[in-house]
Structures are given as C-alpha cells and as structure tokens.
Amino acid sequence: MTEEHVVYIGKKPVMNYVLAVITQFHEGAKEVSIKARGRAISRAVDVAEIVRNRFLKDDVDVKEIKIGTEELPTADGRTTNTSTIEIVLARKT
C-alpha cells in the first residue's frame, strides 16, 4: 500500500476523515489505511465503522487491524508510551 492511501486521524471532526477515506476509494484505491495514536484511536474506530456501515456498506470490509505502542520523547527528555492503531479497509472483490 502506498503512502497516499493512508489517512492519519487527528483532532478534526470525524466526518472530515470519513470523507477522506471515501475519496480515496472513489479515486480507485483497493485498500485504505486509517492510522491513529493516543486519544485519537476511538475517532479512528468511529471513522472505520461509519465508512463500513453507512457509506460503503456493500463495498468495503475491514481487512486488518494492527495495534501497538510507540515510545515518544517528552519535553523533559524522558519517554512516554503511546498506543497506536492501524485499520486497513479493503474493497470487496
């Protein structure tokens, strides 16, 4: 999967990311990856479920879900663990 078929979830409203995912599929992508970390993980799950159940109901399915942990440096030089998720949506064949 190329980097252009990745949607990074942040603090914007959920529907902004839903539109980004739908746009990727309409431009011909076979798979779209939704990535988030920390507090944005629940928003990423919401995006995947809205796309899968409301907009592209018969066309898209969850192919893979990866979870993990990243160590991020803090301002005082220490590191903190942050949870990550990647949800791969694939067009049904």
Swiss-Prot record:
Its main location: cytoplasm. It comes from the Archaea. The gene is albA. Binds double-stranded DNA tightly but without sequence specificity. Involved in DNA compaction. This is DNA/RNA-binding protein Alba. It comes from Pyrococcus horikoshii (strain ATCC 700860 / DSM 12428 / JCM 9974 / NBRC 100139 / OT-3). Keywords: Acetylation, Chromosome, Cytoplasm, DNA condensation, DNA-binding. The keyword Manganese does not apply. Transmembrane segments: none annotated. Acetylated. Acetylation at Lys-11 decreases DNA-binding affinity. Belongs to the histone-like Alba family. GO terms for molecular function: double-stranded DNA binding; RNA binding. HAMAP family: AlbA. GO terms for biological process: chromosome condensation.
